Curated annotation (Swiss-Prot):
GO biological process assignments: mitochondrial outer membrane translocase complex assembly; mitochondrion organization; phospholipid transport; protein import into mitochondrial matrix; protein insertion into mitochondrial outer membrane
Keyword Protein transport part of the UniProt annotation: yes
Keyword Protein transport among record annotations: yes
InterPro entries: Mito_Protein_Transport_Metaxin (IPR050931), Sam37/metaxin_N (IPR019564), Tom37_C (IPR031317)
CDD domains: GST_N_Metaxin1_like (cd03078)
GO cellular component: cytoplasm; mitochondrial outer membrane; mitochondrion; SAM complex
Predominant place of localization: mitochondrion
Bilayer topology annotation: Multi-pass membrane protein
One Pfam assignment: Tom37
Source organism (scientific name): Saccharomyces cerevisiae (strain ATCC 204508 / S288c) (Baker's yeast)
Protein name: Sorting assembly machinery 37 kDa subunit
Role noted for this protein: Component of the mitochondrial outer membrane sorting assembly machinery (SAM or TOB) complex, which is required for the sorting of proteins with complicated topology, such as beta-barrel proteins, to the mitochondrial outer membrane after import by the TOM complex.
General remark: Present with 1580 molecules/cell in log phase SD medium.
Designated gene of the protein: SAM37
Length: 327
C-alpha cells in the first residue's frame, strides 16, 4: 500500500478549475471503488494546500510519500500507483460504476501514448483558455488566485503561469511577446498618448483604438485555438476507438477534465458551440453526462485533511522554501 499525501489546487474540499491535473486525480481516486482499486489509494490523504513549493518542479498535484519520495503531475502519479499494483484487474460495473482499468499488455502502449497526448497537447490548450484568453483571464483566472493563495503570492503566481502558458502556446497561436499583453500595451499606449497630447478626448480615442486592436487579435487567436482543439479532439477520438470503450481509462479522466475546465470558463459557451458544430451535440452531451457523474460521485475514497503550517503557502514558509533553494 502506498502511504502519503497528495497536494492539489483547490478549496473547500473541491479541486479548482485552475488545475486540470488536480481535477482528474480527484476523479481517479473517487473511481477506485473495487477492493483491489481501493488498495491502490487507501493510504493516500488529500490536501488542498495550493502550495507549489512542495513540488520539486513547482507544479501541483504532487504525491509526497511518507519516506520523502515526491511524484508530480497526474500522469506520473497515476503511473506510479499502477506500477504498485501492476497485477491487479478492474472490472466494469453498471450505470457508470466502472473502476479504472489496467488495459491488456498489447494495448498498454496505446493507452500510455494517449495519456501523454492529452497531457501535452490538450492540456496546453486548456492553459491557453485559462491564461491567454483575455475574457477568461480577466473575469475568472486572475480573480481566483486571490481565493487560493496568500498575499502577495496571489498576485505574482498568475503572472508567472501566464508567462509559462505564453511560451507553451507559441506553436498554437504564434509568438506572443510583451506587446501582446493587455496591461503592457495599454500602459505603453497611454504613455505615448500623454506625450503627444494631454487632451482627455485624445486619450479616450487612443485607448479605444488599442482596445479594438486587442479584440481583433484575440479573435485571431481564438480561431487558431478552435482549429487546434478540433484537430486534437478528432485525434483523441480516433485513437480511443482502438481501446475498449466499456471501461474508463486514466486518459479518459484527463481528457474529460480538460473539457470540464474549458467549458466551465466564461468563454466556455463559445467552445461548446464550436465542438457541437464539428462533432454533434449527442457526443458533447454524452461527455457532459460523464463529467457530471464524476463531479457528483460520492467521495468515500477521499481521506482529506487541512494543510499543516509547513505545508501552507504562507509568507513565512515561502521565504523558508526560497532560502532552502540556495543553501
Amino acid at each position: 500500500m502506498v502511504k502519503g499525501s497528495v497536494h492539489l489546487w483547490g478549496k473547500d474540499g473541491k479541486a479548482s478549475l485552475i488545475s486540470v491535473d488536480s481535477i482528474a486525480l480527484v476523479w481517479f481516486i473517487k473511481l477506485c471503488t473495487s477492493e483491489e482499486a481501493k488498495s491502490m489509494v487507501a493510504g493516500l490523504q488529500i490536501v488542498f494546500s495550493n502550495n507549489t513549493d512542495l513540488s520539486s518542479d513547482g507544479k501541483l498535484p504532487v504525491l509526497i510519500l511518507d519516506n520523502g519520495t515526491k511524484v508530480s503531475g497526474y500522469v506520473n502519479i497515476v503511473q506510479f500507483l499502477h506500477k504498485n499494483i501492476c497485477t491487479s484487474k478492474y472490472e466494469k460495473g453498471t450505470d457508470y460504476e466502472e473502476d479504472l482499468a489496467i488495459v491488456r499488455k498489447k494495448d498498454r502502449l496505446l493507452e500510455y501514448s494517449l495519456l501523454n497526448y492529452v497531457d501535452v497537447e490538450i492540456s496546453r490548450l486548456t492553459d491557453y483558455q485559462l491564461f491567454l484568453n483575455t475574457k477568461n483571464y480577466n473575469e475568472y483566472t486572475k480573480k481566483l488566485f486571490s481565493k487560493l493563495l496568500y498575499f502577495p503570492m496571489w498576485y505574482n503566481t498568475p503572472l508567472q503561469l501566464r508567462s509559462q502558458a505564453r511560451e507553451n502556446c507559441e506553436e498554437i497561436i504564434g509568438s506572443l511577446t510583451l506587446e501582446d499583453d493587455e496591461e503592457f500595451v495599454e500602459s505603453k499606449a497611454m504613455e505615448s498618448a500623454s506625450q503627444l497630447a494631454q487632451s482627455k478626448t485624445f486619450k479616450i480615442a487612443h485607448k479605444n483604438k488599442i482596445k479594438g486592436k486587442q479584440e481583433l487579435q484575440q479573435v485571431k487567436y481564438n480561431l487558431q485555438f478552435d482549429n487546434r482543439l478540433q484537430s486534437c479532439v478528432s485525434n483523441w477520438l480516433a485513437a480511443r476507438k482502438k481501446l475498449d470503450d466499456s471501461v474508463i481509462l486514466s486518459s479518459d479522466l484527463l481528457f474529460l477534465a480538460n473539457l470540464y475546465v474549458q467549458l466551465g470558463l466564461p468563454d466556455g459557451n463559445r467552445i461548446r458551440s464550436k465542438l457541437e458544430q464539428t462533432f454533434g451535440s449527442e457526443l458533447l452531451n454524452s461527455m457532459s453526462n460523464k463529467i457530471d457523474d464524476f463531479v457528483h460521485r460520492p467521495s468515500n475514497n477521499l481521506e482529506q485533511r487541512d494543510p499543516q503550517f509547513r505545508e501552507q503557502g504562507n509568507v513565512v514558509m515561502s521565504l523558508y522554501n526560497l532560502a532552502c533553494k540556495y543553501i
